[in-house]
């Protein structure tokens, strides 16, 4: 153990760790739960700390010599080499102060080590005076939230969702001439093609991609430079813009300084907005995954209109059973994301005066929603969607036996007579054609001409 100090006094810290006194106090005071700060968020902190020191050098606030050590430490942090030094829990101060200081202390001590100094000495690099220069926890944490979410959505969610959309679009075209019975209210309905059914899934995902791309730019607004309450106290007038420009350059994402820092600190409306879009995506994916597992149900006593890949044994007691596991995993992800949105919505409503103090729980839930949806889309695509095949025999059986084909007769003999045909066929267990002929409403040739599934699906 080594001794480190802060404004409250001296405390022992594990000698092999780069974090310092404030991080150690957080470990003691907030031994709550198992949820630690996500590594993606820590990486984003590394990006903003690097941008801050680059800016402070340009503005003449930090010497290039000190900056070089800080920059090296930031680069190691960004690369994930220092992840073992970030043990703090989500359940801490609502501004994320302990995590901001955890980052400051780790960067400071690693920079000190690189400079040949003694860990905990705060020389030549001080965690507050140098690493945290021109910053506050109140503006760094929301900035890190935005960087994390924007990067994950850009580089993970959108690509994986696009691949799934493309696969379903390919299936829609592949199934374009396979006519099947439709279902509404879980009851038989008029026909459509399997391709048309899948085109609905494609449209849903297209709409979600549009919505995601629409809200993504709201994350580009950064709070950095607002410091404690949004006034920018203790910062150079050019710091906010220059730092945001550096973040944009480091990430390849067009981040910029928020025009109103008071809103950027006191509210997290952008996070609530993005989470709402992710919830909508979860609802869409839930519908798609549910449809696919129902359509694949069976193999002999279910709907069975499609066949999905057999990935693993499905039962420890029933030999040969194969379950729709990818759909089940996807739907569990969806309910988690919907729950996360509820948490984020409530947390987002709780800003008081100049600060919202629910930031860590909002960050944790949003990050989880993004990576769960990203991973689930990739998994569902690779292990289910690409291998979907039609069961033509089952499809034809249902189509030929459906009473709802009688709908095609509405314009010829009227709704009431068509309904009479359907009820007679159902009650007596005959075909629609047999019932129509027995009632004398149509001839055989008239029935065959009118009741043609191909004419009913607009292909």
Curated annotation (Swiss-Prot):
Keywords: Cytoplasm, Lyase, Tricarboxylic acid cycle. It is found in: Cytoplasm. The record marks 328 as: Important for catalytic activity. Gene3D superfamilies: Fumarase/aspartase (C-terminal domain) (1.10.40.30), Fumarase/aspartase (Central domain) (1.20.200.10), Fumarase/aspartase (N-terminal domain) (1.10.275.10). It catalyses: (S)-malate = fumarate + H2O. The active site is at 185 (proton donor/acceptor), 315. It comes from the Bacteria. It holds the Pfam family FumaraseC_C. Pathway: Carbohydrate metabolism; tricarboxylic acid cycle; (S)-malate from fumarate: step 1/1. Substrate binds at residues 95-97, 126-129, 136-138, 184, 316, 321-323. It is an enzyme of class 4 (lyase). GO terms for cellular component: cytoplasm. Its EC number is 4.2.1.2. PROSITE patterns: FUMARATE_LYASES. GO terms for biological process: fumarate metabolic process; malate metabolic process; tricarboxylic acid cycle. There are 2 substrate-binding sites: the catalytic A site, and the non-catalytic B site that may play a role in the transfer of substrate or product between the active site and the solvent. Alternatively, the B site may bind allosteric effectors. Involved in the TCA cycle. Catalyzes the stereospecific interconversion of fumarate to L-malate. Homotetramer. Belongs to the class-II fumarase/aspartase family. Fumarase subfamily. This is Fumarate hydratase class II. The lineage of its organism: Bacteria, Pseudomonadati, Pseudomonadota, Gammaproteobacteria, Legionellales. The gene is fumC.
